[in-house]
């Protein structure tokens, strides 16, 4: 494990009976980088994320996060060690306000209990942390809105605010721009770029939009049938004929061309 390695995956596999969802993945993630994970549907990307975040236990292999062996640990333990993730579908409390959603995440990070009865007298530090995150993500003007009434793009931003509220060092974003308008997609791209520039976060990003991938990624991991096909710089992946023809298709290959 090199000094700048934050996540080391060795021989990671997950089989469901005879189905090999993930097979023998080796990966070293560097502190501060944004690494994109791409591949066709069924390539094993979601299963891989579920293994990293503790939602699934590996069939074999190991996962090391900094100095910790996190192989098979439950999600709440992995989160407290510094790994947090978003989901492809919004995972927020739609009947609560935007601020309350973030306060719940801040409270969980502090290992305290959320109590509706004490909402008016909530811990001031929790409120301050939540308000700071909402301001950072340009959501302050929506703080008192019920989360279920805001736009889809803003809901995605609220979920990212909740992810950041856990104070992670490694952030797993699962298709963060799925279903978004071009303007909303642009907001997410700029947000991830801004957060990456702070040096506080390392990002793994799964994404089907190749323009988003090439806008954000320092390196790209291509998965196919649960295995690692290639891991390299964007320009190398962009030029790889096997990736272009066999795993992205003609339309996606066109999207990989420089603008």
Predicted features along the sequence, with ranges:
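Glycine-rich phosphate-binding loops of nucleotide-dependent enzymes
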Residues: 2-259
């Amino acid at each position: 494990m090199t000094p700048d390695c934050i996540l080391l995956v060795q021989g990671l596999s997950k089989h469901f009976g005879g189905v090999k969802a993930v097979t023998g993945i080796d990966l070293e993630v560097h502190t501060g980088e944004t690494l994109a994970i791409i591949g066709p549907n069924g390539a094993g990307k979601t299963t891989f994320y579920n293994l990293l975040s503790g939602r699934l236990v590996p069939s074999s292999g190991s996962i090391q996060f900094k100095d910790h062996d996190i192989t098979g640990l439950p999600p709440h333990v992995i989160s407290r060690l510094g790994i947090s993730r978003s989901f492809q579908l919004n995972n927020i409390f739609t009947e609560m306000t935007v601020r309350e959603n973030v306060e719940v995440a801040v409270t969980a990070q502090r290992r305290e209990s959320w109590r509706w009865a004490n909402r008016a007298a909530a811990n001031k530090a929790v409120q301050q942390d939540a308000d700071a995150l909402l301001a950072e993500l340009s959501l302050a003007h929506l703080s008192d809105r019920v989360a279920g009434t805001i736009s889809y793009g803003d809901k995605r931003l609220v979920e990212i605010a909740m992810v950041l509220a856990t104070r992670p060092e490694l952030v797993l974003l699962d298709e963060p721009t799925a279903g978004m308008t071009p303007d909303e997609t642009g907001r997410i791209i700029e947000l991830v770029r801004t957060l990456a520039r702070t040096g506080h976060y390392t990002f793994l990003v799964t994404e089907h939009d190749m323009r988003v991938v090439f806008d954000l990624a320092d390196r790209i991991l291509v998965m196919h049938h649960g295995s690692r096909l290639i891991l390299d710089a964007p320009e190398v992946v962009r030029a790889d004929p096997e990736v272009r023809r066999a795993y992205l298709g003609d339309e996606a290959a066109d999207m990989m061309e420089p603008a």
